[in-house]
Amino acid sequence: MVKNFNYMFVANILSALCKFLILLVIVRLGTPEDVGRYNYALVITAPIFLFISLKIRSVIVTNDKYSPNEYISAILSLNIITLIFVAIFVYVLGNGDLTTILIVSLIKLFENIKEVPYGIYQKNESLKLLGISMGIYNILSLILFYIIYSFSHNLNMALLFLVISCIFSFAIIDRWYLSKYYNIKLHYNNNIAKFKEIFILTIPLAFSSALGSLNTGIPRIVLENLFGKYTLGIFSTIAYVLVIGGLFANSISQVFLPKLRKLYKDEKKIEFEKLTRKMVFIGIFIGMCSVILSLFLGEALLSLLFGKEYGENNIILIILSFGLLFILSGIFLGTTIIATGKYNVNYKISLILLFCILIFSFLLIPKYSLLGAALTITISQFVALISYYYFYKRIF
């Protein structure tokens, strides 16, 4: 388990770093408006494609009923249908960012497909393979994005090369690994009945994931509508600490998921609770480190990395660092709940979070702008953490 943790730790640090550097490239070589366009596209697409991802990696780890081809066929079909509806919807609305939204949707589509091989690696505790696949995808994405964007200053063209990176890593790396190590030949299986079963099984988790992303996006949408893409760009750049932290915590929690599932099935309550405490401690430790760093070095780091206008808003980073502390601990408690197979709990917590986000977004953001958005996220995540703890204590 220690080796697996090390592989995933390195892979997720690399993944988070590459995503951060892509944002940094846009900030340094582009404009706050470009940052706003990119983040607006993420805000629009993330809830939709997180829902349609069906949280398939976690389901593969905890469910033995379906084959890899049934999983990937369901994911592919649902994502293509969703992409078509997104294109029609955005076109009808006449959104000027249609192209950016569609390209980001394509990235999400292929990332969802990659979740199937990731789930297979994880189920078999072959996290070295998962780490290599993630590493190749993220490094290739960063290199191609930097080259294209630095020469063209065309955001959409650079994003297209992220799509190419994702297709390459799946078609060449993942398919080869699955064939070599598991004798799995992926192909499309047109079984509508199975699609329906998988979709119904995963709805609670998928709904929870989509709500989680929507909860993150609502303050950004309100901010953009009231203050414009420039302000959204400033906030989204600073708030990227939450994206990176959440990505890191979600990925690391996947290392513990098979072990937690086994302990729960074997009714080893003491070991189950001990591992849960260890995970929550990791979340608290990382969260406290982010708070301390933002307090003492936040302004200097923001100014150095992004520019003076970002450093002047260090208070936003400090407030969001407390939010990150709550998010990380909540993610690990949520993983513990998923390991029990009680998928319906997570969407209840997401609904509670949505209610809080909506209230505070409309109370605080119009009056306090960036500060209001940061407070909205942090207060709501604290409520979510309390909710996770309440449901966790009712597991056994």
Curated annotation (Swiss-Prot):
Transmembrane in keyword set: yes
Subcellular location: Cell membrane
Example of a GO biological process term: capsule polysaccharide biosynthetic process
Keyword Transmembrane attached: yes
Pfam families (UniProt xref): Polysacc_synt (PF01943)
Pathway recorded for this protein: Capsule biogenesis; capsule polysaccharide biosynthesis
Superkingdom to which the source organism belongs: Bacteria
Membrane spanning residue stretches: 7-27, 41-61, 74-94, 101-121, 129-149, 153-173, 198-218, 232-252, 279-299, 315-335, 351-371, 372-392
Topology versus the membrane: Multi-pass membrane protein
Keywords carried by this UniProt record: Capsule biogenesis/degradation, Cell membrane, Exopolysaccharide synthesis, Membrane, Transmembrane, Transmembrane helix
GO CC term, one of those recorded: plasma membrane
Family to which this protein belongs: Belongs to the polysaccharide synthase family.
Function: Required for the biosynthesis of type 1 capsular polysaccharide.
Name this protein carries in UniProt: Capsular polysaccharide biosynthesis protein CapF
Organism: Staphylococcus aureus
Lineage of source species: Bacteria, Bacillati, Bacillota, Bacilli, Bacillales
